[in-house]
Amino acid sequence: MAITKEAIVKAALDILNREGIANLTMRTLAKELNIKAASLYLHIKNKQDLYNLIAEHITQEISLPEKVDDPKEALTFIAMEFRRALLKTRDSTEIFARSVPITLNRTKIIKFALNALSRYGVSDKNCVTAGNLLNNYVLSFVADEIRTRHTSPEEAKQLEQLWGEQYVLNMDFEEQFLYGLKVLLAGLQQIK
């Protein structure tokens, strides 16, 4: 097999999905590709570069619409698409936390979100901060969603008893996500 950046990313994703980010090392990646670790550096600079490539691959799952007139609809769309893409890869939220948003597709997505935030009424001065807020909401929600999916019915019942039975642990993650997004967007509408 020819070693290309695409082959490296595919092997890295295989390791991530099988063993998690803790086991994604240059050594395990080289072993997965049947090469020596030093050979990886002919294609990628370092682990940071690898994280950037993986994050770029994940964001390629997001197809931006040609045009969305309603900025709230555009922001909801991009948040939902980002969540969907993140849920496909194990430890994706950690990859994004460790990567830098400088790749082509990530830049397009960021520009799309910044434009929608500006049209939504957020001042240009605050658009990047609002974009970070939206990004962090999606990343933290997905991390929590993945963790909560492994909650057994017994654990959920125990949590409800600790909190008070009137507070139900809602396992409809899309409903939870949309509620939180609605709260976030309403706040942005109030404080521009």
Region annotations inferred by a language model:
Residues A7, A11, I15-D49, L53:
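Helix-turn-helix
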